[in-house]
Amino acid sequence: MVSGKRIADVGYRLFSGSMMLLTVYGGYLCVVRAQRYMQRKKQLELAAQSENTASEIIKE
């Protein structure tokens, strides 16, 4: 028969493992979001730069 201590140990390990996986997944989501933010920021800067260049050409 399985003792209560052994059941508690297994439960603790399962809980700890799931928390570890959630932490890793949360870190992954954070990195992906930061990467998308930086990519979007770069696209907006390039669009603004090309718009400024186009308006300078029109003025000439």
Curated annotation (Swiss-Prot):
It is found in: Mitochondrion membrane. Keywords: Membrane, Mitochondrion, Transmembrane, Transmembrane helix. Its main location: mitochondrion. The keyword Mitochondrion applies. The keyword Transmembrane helix applies. It is a single-pass membrane protein. GO terms for cellular component: mitochondrial membrane. It comes from the Eukaryota. InterPro entries: COX14 (IPR029208). Pfam families: COX14 (PF14880). The chain crosses the membrane at residues 10-32. Plays a role in the assembly or stability of the cytochrome c oxidase complex (COX). This is Cytochrome c oxidase assembly protein COX14 homolog. It comes from Danio rerio (Zebrafish).
